[in-house]
């Protein structure tokens, strides 16, 4: 029987694709990408994944985000604006508009808490995540945050999942993990949890198309 749930954050609760948070800003400034946006995003996120475990404090984390944005903007062909915009984007980190929520994210978490489920985050993120979750209004729904940079290991390392399970006081068989990536599936299954794959972009026919569908898998 399911007694608790854990959630990824990027592209599970918060929309990570630049189309949602960066392109509208560029359009408002009259700037149009000249490079391949998808390729630039993949390379920038790869850089982030390779370096985020070192961002254990806020100063290092903010520096990581500046470099992430700079690389993303350069990859989009906006070299002349990359330095200034990367600093501006980091400065806007406490603006909820910088972190658009996946449709149904808060409603799903609210419904789960109303049913009495303990909830935890299991996310590959830097030291800024706890503050970001408060900024977007989701922090109050979670009983524990397992954040890779703060824990020292990243998904699919099962230790990040075990940390969350121990904090929630449940066995792997009593918990379900929700995420959008292969690392979510591999890590959860490695500790014996059930994993639900979610795709906010609707591109994966094997994934849940709406986060609210998580409720269909619970008693």
Feature annotation, model-predicted:
Residues 28, 108-117:
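A short, Lys/Arg-enriched amphipathic alpha-helix followed by its capping loop at the start of a domain
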Residues 1-7, 35, 79-83, 106, ...:
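Asp-based, Mg2+/Mn2+-dependent phosphohydrolase catalytic module
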Residues 2-103:
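N-terminal helical cap/lid subdomain that shapes the substrate entry/recognition surface
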